[in-house]
Amino acid sequence: MSTVTPSAPTLIIVSGLSGSGKSVALKTFEDQDYYCSDNLPINLLPDFVRSLLANHDGSAPRRLAVGIDVRGQADLSQLGDWRQLAADAGVDVKVLFFEASDETLLKRYADTRRRHPLSQLGLSLPEAIARERELTAPLRREADAVIDTSSLNVHQLRRRIITEFTMDHATGLSLLFESFAYKRGVPAEADFVFDARVLPNPHWDPDLRALSGREPGVRDYLEAQPDVQRYLAQLMDFLDTWLPKLGDGTRSYVTVAFGCTGGKHRSVFLAERLARHAREMGWEDVATYHREQD
């Protein structure tokens, strides 16, 4: 049984595919005053945690982020065991897994001209990516959050990490309300996806076309539509019913995504409105992320 308390040391384990943004994530945690260590072998995690807890004079770092690399790892499935040991010792452990589509990874390697870590095995780049997906499958299964960075630039990824994972949060469920454009794909990390394309589109109003769903003109237009009001009422009823079921301690993060054609008006409006509703209902850890806007 875990002995984690709200004031417990925090350990973020950063894992995932090479080229998916792990280095950006670790640098972001470092910028947020986390003590960071990269490429730590899994079998050293227990000693790492013990050294963290052994220093009782207050000088030991309370927030750490550790990068786990696929190279040289004998058995990545051990992560669950080491994670439980850390939790039993009173450390608040979170596992993040970063990934991207094959097409995105191939383009990133072409742009940077860097070699894939598994290329030393004589594999082509597509083969190395496929092999790494197989090797890291145990890490992905263990993750509290899977973050697909295919559509994110460095600045967007940094902002997302800061918003979701580095702020001091009360214990409980972290809620992210996200907007997206269907033409760029559904967010892979979404737990719930709602289609806003059935609603009236402000794009066809010349006075609203250049605005986003965060601006008063678009909000007023959508809130005046009976279909939007009915859609909102049904969404609120659904989320009010089922989000508490996910906040019983079995989940750490939930992403609720809203999609429309361009990710600019309807989906943004819904994400902002439902985030506001969640705060009004007493949820403390609520954030928004507009994939096509931020």
UniProtKB/Swiss-Prot annotation:
GO MF annotation list: ATP binding; GTP binding
Superkingdom of this protein's organism: Bacteria
Gene3D superfamilies according to UniProt: P-loop containing nucleotide triphosphate hydrolases
Entry binding sites for ATP: G16, L17, S18, G19, S20, G21, K22, S23
ATP-binding listed as a keyword: yes
Listed InterPro entries: P-loop_NTPase, RapZ-like, RapZ-like_N, RapZ_C
UniProt-annotated binding residues for GTP: D69, V70, R71, G72
Pfam families per UniProt: PapZ_C (PF22740), RapZ-like_N (PF03668)
Annotated keywords: ATP-binding, GTP-binding, Nucleotide-binding
Described purpose of this protein according to its UniProt entry: Displays ATPase and GTPase activities.
Protein family (similarity comment): Belongs to the RapZ-like family.
Name listed for the protein in its UniProt record: Nucleotide-binding protein Smlt1108
Native source species: Stenotrophomonas maltophilia (strain K279a)
